[in-house]
Amino acid sequence: MNARVWSNPLRDPRDRRLPQIAGPSGLVIFGVTGDLSRKKLMPAVYDLANRGLLPPGFSLVGFARRDWEDQDFAQVVHDAVREHARTPFREEVWQQLAEGMRFIPGDFDDDTAFKQLRDAVEELNASRGTGGNFAFYLSVPPKFFPKVTEQLKKHGLAKAPEGSWRRAVIEKPFGHDLASARELNAIVHDVFEPDQVFRIDHYLGKETVQNILALRFANQLFEPIWNRSYVDHVQITMAEDIGIGGRAGYYDGIGSARDVIQNHLLQLMALTAMEEPASFDADSLLTEKLKVLRAVKLPAELGEHTVRGQYAAGWQGGEKVRGYLEEDGIPASSTTDTYAAVRLNVDNRRWAGVPFYLRTGKRLGRRVTEIAVVFQRAPHSPFDSTATEELGENAIVIRVQPDEGVTVRFGSKVPGTSMEIRDVSMDFAYGESFTESSPEAYERLILDVLLGDANLFPRHQEVEESWKILDPIEEYWATHGRPAPYPSGTWGPEEADEMLARDGRSWRRP
């Protein structure tokens, strides 16, 4: 049963320069009272409407344990939009959007609530022309996925009417190891077909992450040297300057490696290392990313080539901050990692012998995410060693956040009568090169869900391959001591510097 694809007969479907507009549809958000919904999802929906990318009859349904009427829910969305939306508030856009808002109060095991949800969907089909097309956004902890999907199936909400579609959107974490990820996938796929399931990794919605593919495959400049013959190593960093905040209950059972490396960083690595896809579609991208993940080889000595850390008290932004073990809700015996660094190799012809260093952490020097492709030094130099002693390694650095852009670092002669060569940088910054403002990641991802475009969503195979990489590291850490402490505001434990020093390298200072 194929869902009818909404298309403009006057437009070439291959022309992707103009944004596509979603066809008749609605979005149901479970867990609509949470931070993610309030700060990201609701503002993204409004911003899409404000840009004219949602259909006039678009509908938004909230489901949560609150004794609210539809107008109470609309007020909550209104406040969230006013506070967090990227685009200016326009009353006429808001009024049209608000007319399609409905709220269903109830628990996930409440049959009456799901009957109300089914009735609301049918009413919106009739009053707003949503055409039976609905996406169900599970903005809830994974432990609730089985119950929510079971209820959707039980009440006929997962099955689309003839010519319509139903889709499920789920947020990370996609399990906490390979076994739980497989169990989760089986539960979701029992109700929805794999191509109906959209797993959100918001990093893949960021402009600079998508630009990795453009940078590599739309230019002749970079790809010929994007291999082991020229690249010395690759560093992928996601650093945060904040602590865990109020997320102790969630974070203490997970840690930084499971929270970030398993999804964001391995996805960035796959995009950096993959071969050119046959075309820019979801299946072709999946094929090439899977090849990379399946070629990843763990170091033989995990103790030497992986490091975990835990932030201690220190100074951050001019303020004294607590260590992880002093945070509210964290037991003094916790061995949860707030910093993780690993060395991985991609065992194929392009990358054999090139290490990929992945690191992430909280309470580090600054908030930054970047991919640095660091090149080998020139095999021969005609200059005296004194002329090049301040020359570092050439690098292409893709800045994912903040200050999105690309930096190319190379050596140049210092003005003067002598020959002295130092590092200089050429910078491309999104904010300076384009007048268009970049949409938030969730804008792009929600629109893609409504369009059925799965290019930017990890499939279940990628999730499982990522856990196969991380699980042996987590198992090793579980039986080998405690995380190394590092003062807040620094760049992680000394052991991480020593890990690279053993390879004759050092971490970049972003």
Pin down the residues of each PLM region.
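Secretory/organelle targeting and membrane-embedding segments
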Residues: 1-170, 174-510
